[in-house]
């Protein structure tokens, strides 16, 4: 059994956990850490060891500790400088089992890469005082809408299983060009492949592994609002399928560009957000079997306020980094 971290969360983040290998050429645990963590300067590792910031199961690691195989170590990572995302995470529902939120555009679900503190998970752990909170699923950083979190670690599996067993019904809304020549409603099926380390997913020949139902809800002035119902959960599936119909989602700097290449500003420019919203989430309660349904309160500005969307978003909160 994996031991529990002796370090409490900090800034809403769990400590990093490492397990040393069965053997190796290192004389000391410090030597192993220097080799294991190439992105951390050796001087920083020395400072962390001297300050007792790297711990094992019996306490802080001594800087001269001999290498030991199959040993667990914990430490808190240094936080990168992140521009605050000035948009609020709205709580739709909170009970002793789950937290359901309305995630804004531009906020990642979980810490990853350059986005650590400025994520929905870390914000909610800090703001709600829930150190074991974890997501049952994820939304892309640029997608807004309904996102489900589980309050306790021992209940996470029950909710994640609902998603893996396809017992969760999700609908999305998108704003894209209106083309009366595209027959709707329709079901799009294709094969989507996402390679590790490559930003864009691709549609390739072969047996379909992705399926989306596309319906037209309303249109005006050349733009339309669509309901998208994914029957599978491939990376960037909805964006690829809309592009394949000749209806790229507005604000899509990855799949909506004329060149087919992502724009340089795609990761950092908060103007003109992707017009994709996780609108509803419906699932059977794992305890009672009762159907639970949650709906986003957000709207897609490119349809409701085209001029405002073109001008860019207005920040709606101040973000603090206090513990």
Where are the language model's segments positioned?
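RNA pseudouridine synthases
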Residues: 1-323
